[in-house]
Amino acid sequence: MPRKGPVAKRDVLPDPMYNSKLVTRLINKMMVDGKKGKSQTILYNAFDIVNERTGKEPMEVFEQALKNIMPVLEVRARRVGGANYQVPVEVRPERRTTLGLRWLVNYARLRGEKTMEERLANEILDAANNAGASVKKREDTHKMAEANKAFAHYRW
């Protein structure tokens, strides 16, 4: 066991364009091989596409999309008497945001559009309208938690 104690939580700086820490976290989540500038460009272009298609402020659409993706419940494996049970637990707020951003980026990458900007913009728009693969992932997670409700008393 390490003796140094818990690692201090690093705070991210808000991005220059929207002055939002959430946007910075999304940029960092999308970043590949340390190319933050490229990630920033992709996100801002995706936000331009969102603005073009909806006529709304892209931050509002993004926040709505993220709210529709973030899970409230998830299942965690708990070993009791030689058997593994999937125990439903509430998701902490920080983890909710992290999972929401992760699912948004992962399912945007799996889409079929030509550029990442289009993929991300379409995934954000779908999620804002309660559709798309990332929202389906949240629904599946909630279904798993609901199905294993009987094991809720194993919570720790």
UniProtKB/Swiss-Prot annotation:
The keyword Ribonucleoprotein applies. GO terms for biological process: ribosomal small subunit assembly; translation. Keywords: Ribonucleoprotein, Ribosomal protein, RNA-binding, rRNA-binding, tRNA-binding. The keyword tRNA-binding applies. One of its GO terms (cellular component) is cytosolic small ribosomal subunit. CDD domains: uS7_Bacteria (cd14869). GO terms for molecular function: mRNA binding; rRNA binding; structural constituent of ribosome; tRNA binding. Belongs to the universal ribosomal protein uS7 family. HAMAP family: Ribosomal_uS7_B (MF_00480_B). NCBIfam families: rpsG_bact (TIGR01029). Part of the 30S ribosomal subunit. Contacts proteins S9 and S11. One of the primary rRNA binding proteins, it binds directly to 16S rRNA where it nucleates assembly of the head domain of the 30S subunit. Is located at the subunit interface close to the decoding center, probably blocks exit of the E-site tRNA. This is Small ribosomal subunit protein uS7. It comes from Bacillus cereus (strain ATCC 14579 / DSM 31 / CCUG 7414 / JCM 2152 / NBRC 15305 / NCIMB 9373 / NCTC 2599 / NRRL B-3711). The lineage of its organism: Bacteria, Bacillati, Bacillota, Bacilli, Bacillales.
